[in-house]
């Protein structure tokens, strides 16, 4: 069986959805963190492999970006699901922050895509996907090994993602207003 960059992209998304449902939504943060970290590294391979094989192109970029959004949503939705179903003093914070983080994480990517479709650069942002995933991964480990910091991590993720969206809006506005 031949391994292709697109195959790695699909596999990474499917694995992330599985990890989210099987472990994160159940509060199994340690195994979830270990697998999330491992498959996060595998996710880096598709683009690298495509460039090495000379097969990188618009289709692969589109597929990777789209499935990355699905993966991101699966992780955050699984965490929201977990906190909806437990009774803790911080579960309401986790749910609200998770919803905001989900929306703003998706808006971060949308802002870049829309800017690029208008021939504007969108190269700013304090919390791009790598930073968001690193924050989630570290928070899963800390929550599993020490104390539950995930509600606060989701709050930080919501704030950082919101700041990133605002940065992108302002950055793109400068370009598009100057072009007009």
Residue ranges and their predicted role:
Residues 47-90:
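Basic, amphipathic juxtamembrane/active-site segments
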Residues 1-35, 40, 74-180:
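Hydrophobic alpha-helical transmembrane segments
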């Amino acid at each position: 069986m031949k391994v292709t960059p697109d195959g790695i992209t699909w596999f990474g998304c499917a694995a992330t959805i599985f990890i989210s449902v099987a472990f994160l939504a159940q509060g199994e943060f340690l195994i979830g963190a270990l697998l999330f970290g491992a498959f996060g590294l595998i996710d880096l391979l598709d683009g690298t492999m495509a460039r090495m094989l000379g097969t990188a192109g618009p289709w692969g970029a589109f597929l990777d970006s789209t499935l990355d959004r699905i993966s991101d949503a699966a992780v955050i939705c699984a965490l929201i699901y977990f906190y909806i179903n437990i009774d803790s003093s911080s579960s309401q914070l986790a749910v609200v922050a998770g919803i905001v983080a989900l929306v703003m994480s998706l808006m971060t990517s949308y802002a870049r895509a829309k800017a690029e479709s208008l021939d504007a650069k969108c190269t700013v942002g304090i919390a791009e996907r790598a930073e968001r995933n690193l924050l989630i991964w570290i928070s899963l480990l800390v929550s599993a090994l020490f104390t539950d910091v995930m509600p606060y991590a989701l709050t930080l993720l919501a704030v950082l993602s919101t700041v990133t969206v605002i940065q992108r809006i302002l950055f793109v506005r400068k370009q598009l207003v100057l072009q007009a």
